[in-house]
């Protein structure tokens, strides 16, 4: 019987890689131990952690800190999300360092209410990158998101193109990535 974790076996046999979505700290540890190469967090992550029986009290501590840092509700939500994602990013740093930044990314997405404003997406992406060097900016593959992705690629910032619902969207972002990479010589994780 093969004792190697399932996800490590799959990665050796195919180009498939295992990312975990919206994990608790314990789930992140288990995922990494079983071959996870990255993590993604949705805008709903903080609420899921507040509601989680093992994470709720921990999350409330960060929410209290965020409330003390700003009077603006929108900014508070962003600060809270960053505070919650940072410990997860720290857990994936050894993977990131071991692979020279090829794996171990933790993606974070801003509030989807702003997904039609490329300037807000860009601002949020730069702010999110301050969390940790392994932060990957999760950006919707919409016309506004594509504008933001252009800036991220030019700045050599890893991106996670999300909300891809058709082949044409995938082709568009891949063509855009190749075009900008060719022009700038930058090839961030994608």
Language-model regions: role of each:
Residues 14-16, 36-37, 101-106, 131-135, ...:
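Short, well-ordered coil/turn segments that N-cap beta-strands
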Residues 25-33, 147-148, 170-178:
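Catalytic cores of alpha/beta
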Residues 1-26:
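N- or domain-start disorder-to-order transition segments that initiate the globular core
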Residues 12, 32, 153:
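Anion (oxyanion) recognition and catalysis
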Residues 45-48, 53-144, 148:
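Active-site beta->alpha loop and helix N-cap motifs at the rims of alpha/beta catalytic domains
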Residues 19-20, 134-142, 157-169:
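Catalytic beta/alpha-barrel core
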Residues 151, 158-190:
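Catalytic alpha/beta core domains of metabolic enzymes, predominantly
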Residues 8, 27-61:
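An N-terminal structural lobe/cap that precedes and organizes the functional/catalytic core
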């Amino acid at each position: 019987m093969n004792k190697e974790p399932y996800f490590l076996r799959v990665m050796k046999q195919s180009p498939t890689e295992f990312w975990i979505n919206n994990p608790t700290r314990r789930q992140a540890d288990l995922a990494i131990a079983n071959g996870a190469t990255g993590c993604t967090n949705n805008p709903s992550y903080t609420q899921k952690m507040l509601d989680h029986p093992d994470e709720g009290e921990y999350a409330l501590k960060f929410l209290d800190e965020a409330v003390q840092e700003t009077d603006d509700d929108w900014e508070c939500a962003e600060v809270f999300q960053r505070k919650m994602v940072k410990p997860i990013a720290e857990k994936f740093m050894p993977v990131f360092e071991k692979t020279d930044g090829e794996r171990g990314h933790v993606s974070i997405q801003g509030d989807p209410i702003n997904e039609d404003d490329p300037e807000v997406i860009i601002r949020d992406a730069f702010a999110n990158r301050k969390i940790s060097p392994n932060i990957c900016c999760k950006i919707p593959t919409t016309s506004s998101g594509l504008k933001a992705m252009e800036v991220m690629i030019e700045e050599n910032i890893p991106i996670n193109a999300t909300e891809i619902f058709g082949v044409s969207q995938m082709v568009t972002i891949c063509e855009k990535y190749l075009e900008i990479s060719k022009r700038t010589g930058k090839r961030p994780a994608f």
